[in-house]
């Protein structure tokens, strides 16, 4: 028992370290941008770390690391604290160590951070490409496993019965693995919807997921499917058009804002008046908000950081060169993110069609048995138990629902993007209504 407890504790510790490492690598780009903005505005490294510690919206984990480094600077020099800090992410440990060495030697820390951002620009597309490749590989395995479920059900039924709950567990476990792995390996988290929307969406997903789970008991599966599908689809489309699309578009707007401000600074125009003169609708609202001191809450984290950067530039703390560098980073991130989303469109189609495919494969597999003459069918039923297609419907709806939620989270970076789940359930019901007429 003691050995098992030690193993569990050790495994939990490893999982925590892995989570910290993943979070650091995911937030590292934002961390570098925050340091760069405040270092270029004239603050010291210690002051810049204090600013980073207060930016939990962008760097939830690394803000805690920044706070720790600030506290450590009270016991020893900041350079020693940076050099001796050990993080589960080897890459982040080396980054802090190199900054500590430059700080100790008196070499340009600002130039080092600038160089690191240049490297981030060049590698951003590669990071997203590797991420999509890994998700696609795992996604193919998951889809293959899920599409085998109807065959397992039918063959198991012919051999004496295969409990449907096993199929449910297999499907949900496969989708859960895809969700966890994709979330952990995400290169950069950009979409940041209001907490209220995320909370309501989570409630919608669990409530109507529970409704579909109830249909496994054989209680009005068609009616429950229609209710869950329509409700999830309507709410998901509302979130998509009101929030997700804006969050994606703000990625381009962040580049336009930073690049436009940099161009005006190079031309010698007063920044405040230039912001008021912006006419491009893609980023006009953000420029006007900065110019008039209005509060606006972007749904894209880089857009929020870009607005904060322009506010600092308006106070005279940043030049055109710094803003141009950040504009190039914003463009690289936007193109990489939208490129990844475009490659994921196939999985949106697969998620929506997964339940329908399960129904179709089940119907095709059962067709040879249900199309027999009456006397032959009676004899076959006496020899083997031919399964029915009706019990497959709740399973197929639940699979399409879960996959729709997972794919929405991967493609749009938020669990609130649940319209695919509702569309999948309705597509499953449509195919079932057709298939049930033949088997």
Question: How should these model regions be labeled?
Answer:
Residues 1-84, 196-295, 304-311, 318-340, ...:
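Juxtamembrane/interface alpha-helical elements of multi-pass membrane proteins
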Residues 2-7, 118, 123-182, 335-434:
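Bilayer-spanning, highly hydrophobic alpha-helical transmembrane segments
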Residues 42, 113, 414:
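Residue-level signature of catalytic and energy-coupling elements of molecular machines
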Residues 88-89:
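Intrinsic disorder/low-complexity segments
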Residues 100-121, 315-329:
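Short, charged cytosolic
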Residues 113, 176-191:
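Juxtamembrane segments at transmembrane-helix boundaries
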Residues 157-166, 190-193, 213-224:
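Membrane-helix interface and helix-disruption motif detector
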Residues 191-200, 388-392:
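Short, amphipathic, aromatic/basic-enriched membrane-interface segments that mark the entry/exit
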